[in-house]
């Protein structure tokens, strides 16, 4: 188990894409990681397709120096999460420390609001945020999943297998 005892947080809010949350969580657990689900508060969250998720922690309680990596799943949740300073600050701190951040689908909108999309960085996600990612300085890349520095990017639900492969490889280095 390549990720034994590594603590990884996944950020959620109402409307998170169920599969983009749950499949990477299970895959990382298979590798031995402890995956924390963090919400804006401790109330259960309903996924976009009906999954009910109870957070393990609040985002505000997370500390970048205690986390190995961060996952930003898509759905409608990123549009809510990107508005909160606690979210943006955590993402900025993780990025500044060079820690891996997995970004799939609309999760890229959090990366934009946190200011971690680097000028000229290859990016991908839902085509619904393509213009936003490009306007933030990214170079749109229509590939299922890839690693760019400490960021692991993926487009959509159909790309979850490729996302999980790239994510595990980046985290196992």
Spans of features found by a protein language model:
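Catalytic nucleophile serine of serine hydrolases
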Residues: 105
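Extended, subdomain-level signal for the structured scaffold at the beginning of enzyme domains
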Residues: 1-97, 101, 109-119, 130-173
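Anionic-ligand binding patches
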Residues: 123
């Amino acid at each position: 188990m390549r990720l034994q005892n590594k603590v990884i947080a996944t950020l959620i809010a109402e409307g998170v894409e169920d599969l983009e949350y749950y499949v990477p969580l299970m895959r990382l657990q298979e590798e031995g990681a402890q995956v924390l689900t963090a919400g804006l508060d401790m109330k259960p969250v309903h996924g976009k397709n009906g999954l009910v998720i109870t957070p393990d922690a609040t985002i505000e309680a997370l500390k970048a120096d205690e986390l190995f990596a961060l996952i930003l799943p898509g759905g409608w949740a990123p549009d809510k999460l990107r508005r909160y300073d606690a979210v943006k600050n955590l993402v900025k701190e993780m990025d500044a420390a060079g820690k891996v951040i997995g970004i799939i689908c609309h999760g890229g909108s959090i990366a934009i609001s946190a200011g971690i999309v680097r000028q000229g960085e290859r990016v991908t996600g839902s085509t619904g945020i393509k213009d936003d990612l490009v306007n933030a300085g990214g170079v749109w890349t229509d590939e299922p999943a890839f690693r760019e520095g400490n960021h692991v990017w993926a487009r959509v639900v159909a790309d979850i297998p490729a996302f999980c492969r790239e994510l595990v490889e980046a985290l196992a280095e």
